[in-house]
């Protein structure tokens, strides 16, 4: 199975590639309807999603170069928001280098549909004590009232052996297998916060 945020998922039977040393693939671009044009009020950023209440233990990725799992919170917003900043706390990181990916999805039934054109990437080096990461979101990113969303956090690259730990929080979360799309809901997850400003449709 081949998957990328910008293209439709493609499944290739084993007998097509099992006897070949190389395989040329052509992926079909994924097209999505964009949100309506929005006018953003000139207000100070407010909290859209909080981390939750601290839980015992951590959420951790061990000895991964490119994990097949992502995890993060599920949430519903109470009004239309224009997201500007995502924040994430790392408890510790023993990788010499590590790249974390964040994607915000809209949840429609059992389907997770990205609402971003480009994922957010954060590059880290070794961290011995907790550190708060703040990511500025440049593209227009609108969350709609009463819609359900999911923030998937995954380790996409690392220097090899090591681990990265995120503090655990009591908040409804989900672990998703990126290869099979299987999902498991959990009562705790890592702490991601979103900040932005309320938006209204252009009349």
Predicted segments, located by residue:
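Surface-exposed coil/turn segments at beta-strand junctions on protein surfaces, enriched
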Residues: 18, 76-79, 95, 126-130, ...
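A short, solvent-exposed loop/turn motif at the edges and junctions
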Residues: 1-14
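Exposed aromatic-hydrophobic patches
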Residues: 23-26, 129-141
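Extracellular beta-sheet/turn segments enriched in Thr/Pro/Gly and aliphatic residues
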Residues: 16-41
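Solvent-exposed serine/threonine-rich low-complexity stretches and specific carbohydrate-binding patches
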Residues: 14, 115-127
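Beta-sheet-rich sandwich/jelly-roll-like modules and their strand-loop junctions
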Residues: 33-108, 148, 154-203
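Short structured motifs
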Residues: 9-10, 56-58, 69-73, 87, ...
């Amino acid at each position: 199975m081949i998957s990328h945020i910008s293209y439709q998922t493609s499944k290739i039977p084993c007998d097509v590639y099992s006897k070949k040393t190389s395989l040329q693939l052509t992926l079909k671009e994924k097209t999505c309807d964009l949100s309506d044009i929005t006018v953003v009020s000139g207000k100070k950023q407010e909290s859209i999603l909080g981390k939750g209440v601290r839980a015992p233990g951590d959420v951790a990725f061990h000895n991964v170069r490119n994990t097949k799992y992502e995890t993060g919170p599920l949430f519903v917003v109470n009004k239309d928001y224009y997201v500007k900043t995502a924040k994430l706390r790392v408890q510790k990181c023993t990788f010499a280098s590590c790249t974390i990916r964040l994607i915000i999805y809209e949840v429609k039934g059992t389907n997770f549909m990205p609402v971003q054109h480009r994922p957010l990437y954060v590059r880290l080096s070794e961290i011995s004590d907790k550190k708060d990461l703040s990511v500025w979101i440049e593209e227009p990113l609108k969350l709609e009232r009463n819609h359900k969303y999911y923030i998937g956090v995954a380790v996409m690259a690392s220097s090899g052996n090591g681990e990265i730990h995120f503090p655990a929080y009591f908040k409804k979360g989900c672990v998703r297998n990126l290869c099979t799309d299987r999902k498991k809901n959990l009562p705790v997850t890592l702490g991601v916060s979103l900040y932005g400003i309320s938006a209204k449709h252009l009349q």
